[in-house]
């Protein structure tokens, strides 16, 4: 029985904000790709119906943690539909590698891994579509991790079209700050009217991120990290930050630059992959 479950990072290879809805949510067009790097969840089934998170996150109550919320949500929905075996529970711990507030999707990925893993371990039998619907109630980025394939996303991020962008090597750098998403989306100078384009058109254009100008303006650490990376390769912000990344055609090129990273920059090299490491384990 599989007990170690990948919870990979994602990059937004581009991100354009096309509008803002009446409810305040922003509409966007973005390209998600996974990394062969991320957190690992250790999940051991229990038979007493209890959910225990054995590795609490500092400053976050266990019941507010997306890991616990995802487990309880699956338990509730599967139980209500008669698909939860009696006594289903779990002990969950996490090896955390992805920073909070980094734009790598760590929390969303954790939630998706819990949904997929417990659906498998508990033998609930929910479909990917059902798990995706549950995931969306936990966060806009959760569905892409549930589905497990690189995707072009529209709407608020929930309308997904599978795509296969080139699987490049990336140097990903965390500049030592955490950026809450609302800080970027509430900034009055954030571009909110980028014209919508087809995926075919977008893939032919130079990639960029509408959030980057705000992140660089408000966080000098992000600006410094991007300024350094841009000396070596095409680089940009992922999500709303704070992580930034540079793309390379080979691992050796990426690692050569990594060796020159300044001490204040926490960085790693990873491969972009179109099939999530989580789903690769299930094949």
From Swiss-Prot:
Source organism superkingdom: Bacteria
Ligand binding (ATP): 99-109
Gene Ontology MF annotations: 4-(cytidine 5'-diphospho)-2-C-methyl-D-erythritol kinase activity; ATP binding
Record field: catalytic activity: 4-CDP-2-C-methyl-D-erythritol + ATP = 4-CDP-2-C-methyl-D-erythritol 2-phosphate + ADP + H(+)
Membrane-crossing segments per the record: none
UniProt pathway annotation: Isoprenoid biosynthesis; isopentenyl diphosphate biosynthesis via DXP pathway; isopentenyl diphosphate from 1-deoxy-D-xylulose 5-phosphate: step 3/6
One GO BP annotation of this record: terpenoid biosynthetic process
Protein name as catalogued: 4-diphosphocytidyl-2-C-methyl-D-erythritol kinase
Source organism of this protein record: Salmonella gallinarum (strain 287/91 / NCTC 13346)
Gene designation per UniProt: ispE
